[in-house]
Amino acid sequence: DWVFDFPAGSALIKTFYYPIDERDPSAGKQLLETRLLLRKENGWEAVSYAWNKEQNEAFKKVAGKTINVAWIDFTGAERDVRYRVPNVNQCKECHAAEDKITPIGPKARNINKDFEFKEGNFNQLVYWMNREIIDEYPLELKSPVDWTDETKDINDRVRSYLDVNCGHCHSPT
């Protein structure tokens, strides 16, 4: 259940977006925010950037921002929501451990699956081990299932969803 110990100079980056039309992936995406966790010598720093309307540049938002987003859902209905880019202090609501900013997502079990690389399709953890990026990982690692995959057991799907989306706050540890 541990998160990797990243060296100083590491950057964890995640971009948030809404599809323009969920029925047509070729319609593109509306970029909203890119979040960075930057590993410094003395710990992690959280930084949020909000994308402009032209979708060609993002600007640092220390105080956060609210973005009105509209899209078409799978049924063809027009939807809208007020998306909130967190301010620096709000980042700590999820990413704090012992009063310090810390990553919560890059756990071995969450990336223990195959990805497409230039050299072919490989398990992410095996790929990292072969390149000496990591030394080891638990070989009997149980990874979450794709919660949208209706062929999977409903209990596994629910547990996977809750683990990935809720477990970092709602945890006995």
State each model region's role.
Residues 3, 22-173:
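Sequence context surrounding c-type heme c attachment/ligation sites in exported
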Residues 6-9:
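Short, well-ordered loop/turn sites that connect or cap secondary structure elements
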